[in-house]
Regions:
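Conserved nucleotide-sensing/catalytic segment adjacent to the nucleotide-binding pocket
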Residues: 113-157
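Interdomain motor-coupling "hinge/lid" segment immediately C-terminal to the ATP-binding subdomain
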Residues: 39-41, 169-289
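Structural recognition of the conserved hydrophobic beta-strand(s) that form the central parallel beta-sheet
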Residues: 155-161, 182
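Helical "lid/switch" subdomain of P-loop NTPase nucleotide-binding domains
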Residues: 60, 133-136, 140, 162-166, ...
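A short alpha-helical element within helix-turn-helix/winged-helix DNA-binding domains
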Residues: 295, 300-305
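A cross-kingdom feature that marks ATP-driven nucleic-acid transaction machinery
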Residues: 1-81, 85-100, 105-107, 314-318, ...
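Residues in the helix-turn-helix
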Residues: 311
Length: 478
């Protein structure tokens, strides 16, 4: 959680929090009793939180600030507890004094007031209007659209715990009007304390290609830094990136993850649709988590559950919309290519994948692959022009775990949970990069293959293919 800096913030009405920094602007709340600010459109002084959670700079903040300045509507979505409300506190530039208002749609009374006359409630002097948990009242989007189309300089920031753009009504209302961003749990490079998150190894590789990898190999970190970041990576991939977990001992972390799951079953599902049998849905969660890193077969899961295939598809959709799982699509360079067309299933947090899939025995290799995919999702969400992310697999069995590609560059990534990579590990990457070139995906772009390990050394495996430790790829540069 952040300490007070140049931010717009919320102040609990029920707590007296000491201020760490005086006279900073505050976002006022319309009615949520947890937040306090007078009902004029002036700012209050800030009070910092006392949760004990260290401040971690979020890489998404700069991009979110830019999108809010440029577009009338910005949508920020992500799973619960990823820090969406916290990042709003850090959102606006230092010295800004635009009046703002915050509506929490978790509050049923607020939802009733807004439903009675949404345009009037949203149309007043505030220049920044924040609607939190927008998936609870998507009907408000018609009023948001109307006010945004007036072109009066007003900005709307919509926060949601579901992929609202997968909901048809939301997609149709916001088409062409909204900037869309996603906030995932913390990435490894965000586990620093300071004013901003540094660049990661992957940032430099994506910008510079093989030259950046060669520089990483030639300039290893000090022994102390290596020990520090190897330890952080090990803990990060074990416990995931939910910010609330950081100050907790292991037993409390396990309890928090179990509570997170119970809250999801008892509360979040109601925002998405009706599930008649929660026990059956919970069992489906376990079975799907145990399959993290595998091709998704709805029919296999349906057989194990003893339910219809359409029921499993519905469960998967709920889990995808609420950011619990991610379906990685295969790269299809041509319509006629003989490639696997089923998606691969990944849980979006390695700790939850481990907790839910434990009884069914999810393998360490699958969990490591899941952790690498999760880091790639976080990294891609921070990019102004995010690359496409796919996997590659032919019916003959040739496979590469992840393909990051843009028109001018391709990076193929293989996850290996071992300490060392071998030259034979480079062969699939070399073959697939060659195949992509032949199929016109790479074209004139530069191409690079990475085998991500749990080891220490950055080392070449074959021309254009390198072994890179996870902590060097996703941790800070320098």
């Amino acid at each position: 959680m952040p300490d007070a800096r140049s931010i717009w913030s919320f102040m609990p009405r029920t707590a007296s929090w000491p201020s760490r920094s005086p006279s900073l602007p505050q976002l006022r709340s319309s009615s949520d009793p947890r937040w306090s600010c007078k009902y004029s459109l002036k700012f209050c002084s800030i009070a910092a939180n006392t949760t004990g959670v260290g401040f971690h700079p979020r890489r998404l903040l700069a991009l979110l600030r830019a999108r809010l300045a440029a577009r009338p509507i910005t949508v920020l979505t992500g799973a619960r507890q990823t820090g969406k409300t916290t990042i709003v506190r850090d959102l606006l530039p230092a010295g800004g004094d635009l009046p703002s208002v915050y509506f929490s749609l978790d509050d049923p009374d607020e939802r009733l007031r807004l439903a009675a006359d949404p345009v009037r409630r949203l149309d007043h002097g505030a220049r920044i209007v924040v609607l939190d948990e927008i998936q609870k009242q998507p009907a408000l989007l018609d009023a948001v659209k109307l006010l945004a189309d007036r072109g009066e300089g007003r900005r709307f920031l919509l926060l949601g715990s579901a992929q609202v753009l997968l909901l048809r009504q939301v997609r149709e209302t916001l088409a062409g009007r909204a900037a869309l961003l996603e906030l995932w749990p913390l990435g490894l490079v965000e586990r620093v304390e300071g004013p901003e998150a540094p660049l990661s190894g992957l940032d430099q590789i994506w910008r510079e290609g093989e030259a950046a990898v060669r520089r990483m190999a030639e300039s290893p970190p000090s022994a102390d830094d290596a020990r520090l970041w190897r330890g952080r990576a090990e803990e990060h991939f074990l416990w995931g990136g939910y910010p609330a977990l950081e100050p907790m001992p292991p037993e409390e972390r396990r309890a928090w993850l179990r509570d997170f799951r119970r809250t999801y079953l008892g509360r979040d599902l109601a925002d998405l649709g009706r599930v008649a049998d929660l026990d059956q849905f919970a069992l489906a969660q376990n079975l799907l988590a145990a399959r993290t890193g595998q091709l998704l077969s709805h029919s296999e899961v349906a057989r194990e559950l003893g339910v219809a295939v359409n029921t499993v598809k519905r469960y998967v959709r709920f889990l995808e919309i609420s950011y619990q799982l991610f379906l990685l699509r295969p790269l299809q360079p041509t319509v006629t290519a003989r490639l696997v067309k089923s998606p691969k299933l990944y849980w979006t947090d390695p700790a939850l994948a481990r907790l839910l899939g434990e009884r069914a025995g999810a393998a360490d290799g699958a969990l490591f692959e899941t952790a690498i995919l999760d880091e790639l999702l976080r990294w891609a969400s921070w990019q102004p022009e995010p690359p496409a992310l796919h996997f590659f697999r032919t019916h003959a069995g040739r496979e590469v775990d992840f393909i990051l590609h843009a028109p001018d560059r391709v990076v193929a990534i293989e996850a290996k949970s071992s300490e060392r990579a071998h030259r034979t590990d480079a062969r699939p990457l070399t073959e697939v990069l060659g195949a992509l070139t032949m199929r016109g995906v790479a074209g004139d772009a530069w191409r690079l293959g990475l085998v991500v390990t749990r080891g220490r050394e950055v080392e070449p495996l074959a021309p254009g293919v390198w072994a890179v430790p996870d902590w060097r790829l996703f941790g800070p540069v320098g």
